[in-house]
Swiss-Prot record:
SMART domains reported in the protein's UniProt record: KU (SM00131)
Domain (BPTI/Kunitz inhibitor) ranges: 231-281, 287-337
Disulfide bonds: C91-C188, C231-C281, C240-C264, C256-C277, C287-C337, C296-C320, C312-C333
Chain positions of site Inhibitory (P1) (chymotrypsin, elastase): L241, G242
Phylogenetic classification of the source organism: Eukaryota, Metazoa, Chordata, Craniata, Vertebrata
Record-given protein name: Protein AMBP
Any one GO MF annotation of this record: serine-type endopeptidase inhibitor activity
Amino acid sequence: MRSLSGLLLLLTACLAVNASSVPTLPDDIQVQENFDLSRIYGKWFNVAVGSTCPWLKRFKEKMTMSTVVLIAGPTSKEISVTNTHRRKGVCESISGTYEKTSADGKFLYHKAKWNITMESYVVHTNYDEYAIFLTKKLSRRHGPTITVKLYGREPQLRESLLEEFREVALGVGIPEDAIFTMPDRGECVPGEQDPVPTPLSRARRAVLTQEEEGSGAGQPVTNFSKKADSCQLDYSQGPCLGLFKRYFYNGTSMACETFLYGGCMGNGNNFLSEKECLQTCRTVEACNLPIVQGPCRSYIQLWAFDAVKGKCVRFSYGGCKGNGNKFYSEKECKEYCGIPGEADEELLRFSN
């Protein structure tokens, strides 16, 4: 469920946002199929967030992972929400209630002070591992806001779940640079204060650049020199907190695979596209790999080397989980796999 105090703080700041800066709120939000309310109860860690609210990007460096506990509410029509988080160096806990609706997986929160009703939807969950919540708010005066949050039963989640969350957020119009993970500083006890930094740590912080600190505010860094020399490195997410989709070359599978880049530092095995990755890192050994369409259904017409026929052939690439035997033109395929051109073939016939 939405982090209650974090949600209210976010939406308060967003009241000053003009409606023209955010997308139209979707009307056809699909909740988790066969939603089971009793299984969503318990403690969740707020692992990642994305929002159309510009305030979020300005203050995301101050946000850390919080916990949310959901239990049955004081009435059969409500659920209770308790959020525990750090705010201004002090751990605090705030409780509230959400109203059930006739649609399973959809809840309402009404703030009389602002005369705003927020709608929250459980769009994806497997109950035991993760849950993705989408909240939309419409202010008649200031327009719509969409916020998506990823929760986990544990502070760390599989990268495939982070990718699923990212796709959900992008799908409702949230910009890529407004989607990020929450730094995990551990759970806190309400009332306790964060330790005061020592003079030594203050001095060290003063000389660090924003990228070295890993604030999450840095821009993607991909201008490494001699990127081909980095192809055998393991991928590096870097210390920042963004969720930027990138490609890295896997020397074992001889394929370019996706990973989520934090937005700063990392290494040179980091590419914006599969094409750039393959054309930088692929070797001639790729010509001996099988032709793999992959499970996705984009049906992109590419070229591959057919080792049985001994020539380059067209094939339909699904768009994901292929291998290095994938070329973007017939010429490229022939150059990699040693197929002679027409002039070369004529020369060979003449010399024989």
